[in-house]
Regions:
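Outer-membrane beta-barrel proteins
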Residues: 41-47, 101-105, 142-146
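Residues on the lipid-exposed face of transmembrane beta-strands in outer-membrane beta-barrel proteins
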Residues: 18-24, 77-83, 118-124, 187
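Flexible, surface-exposed loop regions and adjacent strand-edge segments
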Residues: 49-56, 107-113, 148-157
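Surface-exposed extracellular loop regions of Gram-negative outer-membrane beta-barrel proteins
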Residues: 80-105, 113-119
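Transmembrane beta-barrel strands of outer-membrane/channel proteins
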Residues: 1, 34-40, 92-98, 133-139
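Surface-exposed strand-loop-strand hairpins of Gram-negative outer-membrane beta-barrel proteins
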Residues: 1-15, 51-61
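Extracellular loop and loop/strand-boundary signature of outer-membrane beta-barrel proteins
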Residues: 4-8, 61-67, 102-108, 176-184
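Outer-envelope beta-barrel architecture signal
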Residues: 28-34, 86-90, 127-133
């Protein structure tokens, strides 16, 4: 029996990696934590997506009808600190992730992505309730280039808009894109 999958994510995902985590109690009120890791990945039978982080940037992806596999690597680290003093509790966390993926057959995408994030939160104990506020910030950037090296020529590359639509103005030989976003949230 088959398994449901999105064509843009492929139908087989093979990963190998290592993760390191740490949690240290500095005192009765202070904690620090962190993690770092590396992951190597191969997605097979990917169609209509030549980008990394599809779930984050969709539906604005570059795609073609040929598709194939995508190989990639990801490195990340993050950490944080939390403290409690009387009725107050607060914490800060931050992290960075760098990824790249590619294919060594036409069409040949080469994507790099960086993802930086910070969050800060504070809370106050009021009887059996806790009132809290938090803010976070994220800076994400992705650069994508597609090349064709075979003598057979190239296929059309589409800049997808979602719901099966593409941006006709850039269809054809436009093979580079850049996704950049920053933002924050307060709660």
């Amino acid at each position: 029996k088959g398994k449901a999958s999105l064509k843009q994510e492929g139908d087989k995902d093979t990963r190998i990696g290592v993760d390191v985590n740490s949690f240290v109690i500095l005192s009765e009120r202070d904690r620090v934590f962190g993690s770092a890791g590396y992951r190597s990945e191969k997605q097979e039978n990917v169609l209509w997506n030549e980008n990394i982080d599809w779930k984050l940037i969709a539906p604005y992806v570059t795609g073609d009808s040929i598709g194939g596999f995508l190989k990639g690597e990801t490195y990340y680290f993050n950490g944080g600190y939390a403290s409690e003093s009387g009725s107050w509790i607060w914490g800060i966390t931050g992290g960075y992730r760098a990824s790249h993926n590619y294919r060594d057959k036409d069409p040949r995408p080469r994507n790099t992505a960086s993802d930086l994030s910070f969050a800060l939160g504070a809370g106050y104990r009021l009887g059996t309730y806790r009132l809290g506020v938090s803010a976070d910030f994220r800076l994400y950037q992705q650069k994508s280039e597609i090349s064709f090296l075979a003598d057979k020529g190239s296929t059309s590359v589409y800049h997808m808009l979602g719901l099966g639509m593409d941006y006709v103005r850039f269809a054809g030989k436009q093979t580079g894109t850049k996704h950049q976003a920053s933002g924050g949230e307060e709660a």
